[in-house]
Structure formats: structure tokens, C-alpha cells
């Protein structure tokens, strides 16, 4: 059966709400990540904010490389969502999968803003389909060490 975008979002919110309630009983915080698919209800700032309004105890994994899918400004996205962010994925974008700092996302600037905002959590490096994952990981780790130690 065909479901509209809104129906899918409502079902997703209901399921997430149930998961969050069960997890809370176990002392677990549930996070949702902005997703890099134009058809996803969590691919844009407004979609993420809607889920946060529906599920007050749902938290965010902020992925630096995904808001570009909706052509949204990464700094605007951070400011809109930062109060609920408890984890950050460092992902840069290029024509191919690239190391953090090698693509067109302003990684040094956005990660600097995140740190300046008081974020004290981890920065997880994320690459999707890199030809040489090890080399990409080493370059990304070096970028983070050189700029954020």
C-alpha cells in the first residue's frame, strides 16, 4: 500500500516514541541521525525539528555531510538543532568519498563552531564507500588531531 510522506513520518514517530519509552526504562538515550536521502523525513532541519517536537526525549546524532542533500546550510542546521545533539559524525563530501577536510563541507569551521557551542562529546569519523578506507581514516584522524586537540 502506498503511504504519503506525512503518513510515513507519523508511523516513524510512533515507532520511535515507543522505542524511546522502552529505552528510557533501561537508562538508554536514543538518537536519530539526519539521513542523506531526499525522501527521508529526517533529511532536513525541519524534519529533524518535527521529530524532536514529537518525541521530547529523542536526541540527535549530527552528521556534518548530510544536510547538503537538501541544500541546507550546515551552520544554520547546527544552530537549529544543537540543543539536542549528543553525538557528531564527521563526514565530508566530494565527487567521490573523501577524508574529513578534503571535501567541500567547511569541516574546520563547522567543527570549530560545534566545539565553541560547548559540545564535549565524541567526533566519529564516517566515510561511505571510500576506495581505500584505511587511508581515508588516517587522513581524517590526522585532520581532527591537527585541528581539534
PLM regions: where:
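Active-site acidic/histidine proton-transfer and metal-coordination neighborhood
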Residues: 1-60, 69
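A structural alpha-helix within SAM-dependent methyltransferase catalytic domains
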Residues: 13, 17-20, 24, 49, ...
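Short, basic, helix/turn surface patches
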Residues: 17-20, 59-64, 115-116, 120, ...
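Structural preference for beta-strand elements that scaffold enzyme active sites
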Residues: 27-33, 57-61, 85-87, 96, ...
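Gly/Pro-rich active-site loop or hairpin
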Residues: 41-45, 49, 66-120, 128-138
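C-terminal helical cap(s) of enzyme catalytic domains, especially alpha/beta-barrels
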Residues: 134-149
Amino acid at each position: 500500500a502506498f503511504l504519503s510522506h506525512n503518513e510515513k513520518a507519523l508511523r516513524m514517530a510512533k515507532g520511535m516514541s515507543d522505542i524511546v519509552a522502552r529505552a528510557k526504562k533501561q537508562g538508554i538515550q536514543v538518537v536519530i541521525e539526519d539521513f542523506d536521502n531526499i525522501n527521508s523525513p529526517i533529511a532536513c532541519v525541519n524534519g529533524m525539528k518535527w521529530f524532536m517536537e514529537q518525541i521530547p526525549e529523542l536526541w540527535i546524532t549530527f552528521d556534518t555531510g548530510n544536510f547538503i542533500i537538501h541544500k541546507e546550510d550546515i551552520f544554520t542546521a547546527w544552530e537549529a538543532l544543537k540543543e539536542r545533539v549528543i553525538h557528531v559524525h564527521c563526514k565530508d563530501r566530494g565527487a567521490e568519498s573523501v577524508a574529513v577536510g578534503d571535501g567541500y563541507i567547511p569541516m574546520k569551521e563547522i567543527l570549530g563552531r560545534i566545539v565553541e557551542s560547548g559540545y564535549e562529546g565524541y567526533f566519529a569519523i564516517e566515510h561511505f564507500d571510500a576506495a581505500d578506507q584505511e587511508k581515508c581514516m588516517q587522513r581524517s584522524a590526522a585532520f581532527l588531531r591537527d585541528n581539534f586537540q
